[in-house]
């Protein structure tokens, strides 16, 4: 029988870099991956909690399921782990302040994180962010805890497309806007953005 030849498509320099990469190099390389920004919320009222997702992706279209990765050290994770239902709020391009509000570890309480933004109550009791790019209402099927994170498979029970014109993305450790906001579109076509006073007002 003939032998099987295995060819590596990486140049020698890439193979060497992969073999000797240190933690700093790995993290720097990971920061080159642009990704959407989502806030995961559970509960309502005084029981509501939220945390920034490390990543969100579509696991399956039929049946509809998301793969949601969250940091287990975040203050909101304990409430998230106790709840079987959660909402994934995909942030729009003009919601950078909300992203900063849900990032960090500084407080064990989550109440203050909901002080900005307009929050709505869904039929099943979940809090969701108005005017975001999209909202997925999910039910946890399985949670896999690995290292610092929890990998959650969530069945999508309902999805809503929001009114955001652009998307918020994370790249190289910073947030940026992809696409134009409604106000930028208004200015481009010579209209006054919403919220700006008209002449004579």
Regions found by a protein language model. Give the residues of each.
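Basic, polyanion-binding surface patches
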Residues: 2-201
């Amino acid at each position: 029988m003939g032998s099987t030849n295995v060819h590596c498509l990486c140049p020698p320099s890439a193979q060497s870099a992969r073999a000797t990469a240190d933690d700093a190099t790995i993290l720097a390389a990971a920061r080159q991956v642009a990704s959407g920004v989502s806030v995961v919320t559970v509960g309502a009222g005084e029981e509501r909690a939220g945390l920034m997702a490390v990543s969100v992706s579509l696991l399956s279209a039929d049946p509809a399921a998301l793969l949601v990765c969250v940091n287990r050290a975040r203050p909101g994770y304990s409430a998230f782990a106790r709840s079987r239902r959660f909402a994934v709020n995909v942030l729009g391009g003009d919601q950078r302040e909300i992203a900063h509000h849900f990032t960090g570890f500084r407080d064990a309480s989550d109440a203050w994180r909901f002080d900005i933004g307009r929050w709505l109550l869904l039929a099943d009791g979940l809090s969701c962010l108005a005017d975001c790019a999209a909202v997925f209402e999910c039910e946890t099927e399985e949670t896999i805890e690995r290292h610092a994170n929890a990998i959650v498979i969530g069945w999508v029970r309902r999805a809503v497309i929001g009114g955001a014109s652009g998307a918020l993305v994370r790249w190289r450790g910073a947030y940026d806007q992809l696409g134009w906001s409604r106000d930028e579109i208004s200015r481009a076509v010579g209209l006054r953005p919403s919220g700006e006073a008209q002449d004579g007002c």
